[in-house]
Amino acid sequence: MSLYLNASILVALFVIDPSSSRAEAFLSAHPEIVVVSDFGVAEFSSAVGRRVRTGDLTREDGQLAFCNFDNGSHDLHTGRRSRLPISTQQLGFLRRLDINLRTADAIHIAISRRLGAALVTFDRSMAAGARALGVAVATP
């Protein structure tokens, strides 16, 4: 089964973060194909930008995170990664009134479901929603 990474994992992989070692250890232990969606890249970019604007990261560190992501300085880039364009065609479960889903979470879950991939996230709420919808979840 492939692994679909959401932004919480991407940030931990490319920015020094309290979760970085867990994310790196998880990927090292799982040789599966890694999928990153364009939506995940957008969320990653937004999160890095927010950290720069709030002073949690220097501008240089933010630019380095983008450069490293784009140029492949992580195991994520050893041919295991696949990029996926955004598709929101399978978001009907947003109308389920029994599951609390944020829009961004629903998009990540829909992409994972479409791929038949395990959703890899640190976000407990997203993980719970995915499980409720029958999507496999891996939490490092």
Give the ranges of each region predicted by the language model:
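Hydrophobic/basic alpha-helical segments enriched in Actinobacteria
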Residues: L3, S21, R59-D61, T78, ...
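Short, well-structured N-terminal submotif of metal-dependent ribonuclease cores
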Residues: M1-G40, R51-L64, A132-L133, A138
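Short beta-strand scaffold positions
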Residues: L5, V36, R81, T103-A106, ...
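Short, flexible loop segments at the rims of nucleotide/cofactor-binding pockets, characterized by
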Residues: V11-L13, R96-I99
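Acidic, PIN/NYN-like endoribonuclease modules and their adjacent C-terminal/linker elements
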Residues: S2, S37, T88, I109-P140
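Short glycine/serine- and small hydrophobic-enriched flexible loop segments
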Residues: S46-R53, R114
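Acidic catalytic patch
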Residues: V41, A65-L97, D105
